[in-house]
Amino acid sequence: MKKLNSSEFRQMFLDFFKEHGHMIMPSASLIPQDDPTLLWINSGVATMKKYFDGSVVPKNRRITSSQKSIRTNDIENVGKTARHQTFFEMLGNFSVGDYFRDEAIPWAWEFLTSPKWLGLPKEKLYCTVYPKDEDSFNVWVKAGMPADHIVKLEDNFWDIGEGPCGPDTEIFYDRGQENNDVAEDDPENFPGGENARYLEIWNIVFSQYNHLPNGKYVDQPHKNIDTGMGLERVLSILQDAPTNFETDLFLPIIHATEEMTDGKKYGENDEDTTAFKIIADHVRAVSFAIADGALPSNSGRGYVLRRLIRRADLNGQRLGIKGAFLYKLVPVVGKIMESHYPEIMDQRGFIENVIQNEEERFQSTLDTGLTLLDDLIEKAKNSDDKTISGKDAFKMFDTYGFPYELTFESAQDAGLKVDKKGFDAEMQAQKDRARKARGDLQSMGRQDVTLMNIKDKSEFEYGVYEEPHAKLIDIVVDDKLVDKANGEHATLVFDKTPFYAERGGQVADHGGIYNQDGELVAKVTDVQHAPNDQNLHFVDLILPMEKGQEYVLKIDKERREGLRHSHSATHLLHAALRQVLGEHTHQAGSLVDPDYLRFDFTAMEPMTPRELKSVEELVNQKIWDAIQVKTTITTPEEGEKMGALALFDGKYGDKVRVVQMSDFSSEFCGGTHVDNTDQIGIFKITSESAVGAGMRRIEAVTSKKAYEYLANRSSLLDDIQEVVKATKPENIVDKIDSIENELRDSQKQVEALTKKINQAKAGEIFDNVKQAGDLTVIAAIADVNGMNDLRELADNWKSGNKSDVLVLAAENDGKANMIISLDQRALDKGLKAGDLIKKAAPLFGGGGGGRPNMAQAGGKKPEGLNDAIKAVIDEISNN
């Protein structure tokens, strides 16, 4: 039998069938194309439907592939069994009306047993066939399979209702009775039975019948072959691995995860081993799914991703890993799979970003959620029906981000149930509330008859800062049209106005309204568009105003100038991003404010410092080039011919306004702009950050605000230079490096002294041994600085055989910590550190967990530590 790594084995399979005239088909995306019946591609044959149903004829009727697949119907079993995975690869060979069993079976036997290929021991191979399928039985015997290794089973008929169907044959590898989970004389101990000895490695379906609606079976005109071999399963045989998780597809991920823990190792105990497996499986699944375009959300595929990421994070927490960590494993996955699937490394930054964002959302509530979940489990244990209520499960989902399935799994592990019907009812009630809220908002809009009945024209005047003769044509007070406004607030409509109404990301103008005598009668605080596109001026009244009178409208010029600078700079920024990052970069939103601008855009990964510098320099260069800004009113069609970018889903009227800055930038836009780019003065990016999956945000300032920003930075630099005592600005970095080195040296000295102090304290603590039942216990509140010091004391205790049980606690900065360690004698008595810590933690306002021999917890009520220690000692005494 050949020893192959995963890459070699995958390629060998494809090469074998290529030698037999097959076309190698690249793996399809995990997201089904034009197949609404599937959430994910879950097998190799799922990508072949168009060929098997005759809607598409392949260039070659013989096809082979290694298809990435996801199955999520039994996520809760992943990590708890040897073979369950959410993400896996299905190797397959397919015949679309070409060869049939006379070729498929001998080829399978050849690939498995030939020394040129896998070279598996023939005596280890078995197969099952459909009892009436004598042809397959005979072909197997002819190929070389011993007749007594062929089992006839009624289950060997592939049929999912109407459509193609037929008998199948499954191939099994005998792993030996020593690897079995049932007795040798167990009735399930046979190939195809429920046992761990005979591992199914390959399934060949002979699709030769058509299942009619009337229940009859008729021959298909073209017979097809559909096969599936689990890459991970066969690899476990080739690498002599007990389970799929000990192969080179998983072990590097598991080892990388071990490095993130506080010393936990795969295989040390069942609980931790399960957690390692879950993390390794789930990071593979989410990495490939995101690379193929899926993103976390609350429905469909997105919900599956969210559930997998959060399930992995929950298990990371159980291993003692703090904070977001799963995203750090993406490059490990990418490196393993790079030879056949380069997309992970190609999109590494984007995938990491999506996972990290999702993790950080969950991490913010994880600790609190776990504490609450522990409380709910204890509450349910003490209830008559041993059930977590649907209301409580929904609170875990709605408030703390725990998908129902995570609560269900935790309850199941504790021997409890969850009220699923109650959870569903709470979920539906929330949806109903949201739907009603949306309906109320819509109905409010529909029922705003007052604004809808305003038909008078109200024109906005570009380039005007003051309108001396604006006629007041409508007044709205308390949702009613009136002729006179003399209260505190009103909404006004003028026949013409210089005030820009908020639209397209640009906020509204502010300013004042004056009477013909020059008296200020109202302050304009906002301007919005009415249903019939009039400009609604929201004002704070100073003097009464009357319909039909003319007023002088004056906008805040400084605010308008800031808006013009920001809006034109936004266009330049958009164009610069497309030039530096590529034309795939699209605007996803913007805010044009007088003090700054915010621009959201599509991006697969964070911008590099070099890219940011290039964008900033390009925008400033266009500002200093003094480009004339040209506006044109035209049709949408003509605007597109001019090269203008059409935003906002292309929803435009008969006429559009195109804003051009030479051939560098051209966009449909109704906002206010500078006349020449040199009026912007200067442009400075202040931040670049993530908004969500696949979206980045740039914030920037212009003109006077940019000068103020740079002046503040310069002043800050002067302060830093003075603090670090650098002779000149260019020496600041070297000076800081020197200070950091000194700090590191000092920290090492502090740590060394702390260690000596802790050793001295350990002697005092460990001398005080108490008796609890027939076990010896050391229990104390130690004068140390938190959990790290407690762990160090626990390590000292382990090396000295000081007692059977160690219970140490500490108070630091108003927080409580506790650690419990058990030696073998205590474990033999049936004690578990995790159970003891869960009993103690609520007494000091905390939660925790751990392994049978060691557990730890943190809380917010240090005043409860003495009671907690007493509770642990009492529990030990009563054991």
Swiss-Prot record:
Molecular-function annotations in GO: alanine-tRNA ligase activity; aminoacyl-tRNA deacylase activity; ATP binding; catalytic activity, acting on a protein; transferase activity; tRNA binding; zinc ion binding
Reaction catalyzed: tRNA(Ala) + L-alanine + ATP = L-alanyl-tRNA(Ala) + AMP + diphosphate
Reported cofactor(s): Zn(2+)
Binding positions for Zn(2+) per the UniProt entry: H567, H571, C669, H673
Keyword presence, Aminoacyl-tRNA synthetase: yes
Pfam family, one: DHHA1
One example of a Gene Ontology biological process annotation: alanyl-tRNA aminoacylation
Domain of life from the UniProt record: Bacteria
Localization, UniProt: Cytoplasm
Top enzyme category: ligase
N-terminal signal peptide: none
Record CDD domains: AlaRS_core (cd00673)
Reported function: Catalyzes the attachment of alanine to tRNA(Ala) in a two-step reaction: alanine is first activated by ATP to form Ala-AMP and then transferred to the acceptor end of tRNA(Ala). Also edits incorrectly charged Ser-tRNA(Ala) and Gly-tRNA(Ala) via its editing domain.
Name the record gives this protein: Alanine--tRNA ligase
Source organism: Lactobacillus acidophilus (strain ATCC 700396 / NCK56 / N2 / NCFM)
